[in-house]
Regions:
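Adenosine-nucleotide cofactor-binding segment
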Residues: 173-182, 194-208
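Glycine-rich Rossmann-fold phosphate-binding loop(s) that bind the pyrophosphate
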Residues: 152, 181-184
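Glycine-rich beta-strand-centered segment in the early N-terminal region that forms part
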Residues: 22-36, 50-98, 140-142
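Residues forming the Rossmann-fold NAD(P)(H) cofactor-binding site
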Residues: 187-188
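NAD(P)H dinucleotide-binding glycine-rich loop of Rossmann-like/cofactor-binding domains
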Residues: 94-177
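Cytochrome P450 core scaffold surrounding the K-helix E-X-X-R motif
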Residues: 41-47
Length: 208
């Protein structure tokens, strides 16, 4: 099958290449890729300034903003053939830091996490991919057209979560918010702010 791969550190290596078909292990889903998002991190990897290949490999399948349809699932569990899913990007440090040990591996303190399509694990940029059921998120079928935005939306949701955690240490009743930057993350942040009932303002630089 075909996949979008790169040699991390090599700015001229991005290519569609042939890779082996994935074989799901115990507790894994086999997924047909439907859509793949690209962001600034992917551009950095393609430029050769970021990214790490899996151990003993020189190429990495990129892509961490995923959307797919389940082709095969374990008999037991919540997933079924045809489900629309996205894959979680990060995996915790196998010798966990304090944050990883309590399940907050998005806040890993020692940097020994791995990430699909970024750091030492192939990403979701292939025709088919596998993912553990523990790192798959099932979406409502009505979100199929926008589901590829789930991963960047989680980045924004985490930012809001941290804002609320800090604010609620004392009296906290925000009325308005300023979002600096009108890229994908900034626009998603503005949308979530509006969803919270806030008066949202977005600031960006115009260079044209």
């Amino acid at each position: 099958m075909q996949a979008l791969t790169v040699r991390p550190g090599d700015a001229d290596s991005l290519a569609v290449t042939e890779v082996d078909e994935p074989s799901p292990g115990s507790g894994e889903l086999l997924v047909e890729g439907l859509a793949l998002g690209g962001c600034g991190t992917d551009r950095e990897i393609a430029r050769g300034s970021y990214g790490w290949a899996p151990p003993n490999r020189d190429r990495l399948v990129i892509g961490h903003e995923s959307l797919g349809r389940v082709l095969k699932s374990p008999q037991a569990g919540d997933f079924r053939r045809g489900d629309i899913v996205v894959g979680v990007v990060r995996r915790p440090d196998p010798v966990p830091c304090g944050a990883c040990a309590i399940g907050e591996f998005d806040m890993c303190r020692n940097g020994r996490y791995t990430e699909r399509g970024i750091k030492e694990i192939d990403g979701y940029g292939s025709q088919r991919w596998t993912v553990s059921v523990d790192y798959a998120v099932k979406l409502d079928p009505g979100l199929a057209d926008v589901g590829v935005l789930m991963e960047p939306t989680t980045v924004v949701a985490k930012a809001w979560e941290q804002i609320v955690r800090i604010g609620e240490r004392s009296w906290f009743e925000p009325k308005r918010v300023l979002v600096t930057g009108a890229g994908p993350i900034g626009l998603l942040a503005a949308m979530l702010g509006t969803q919270r009932g806030l008066d949202v303002h977005v600031l960006d630089r115009v260079t044209d």
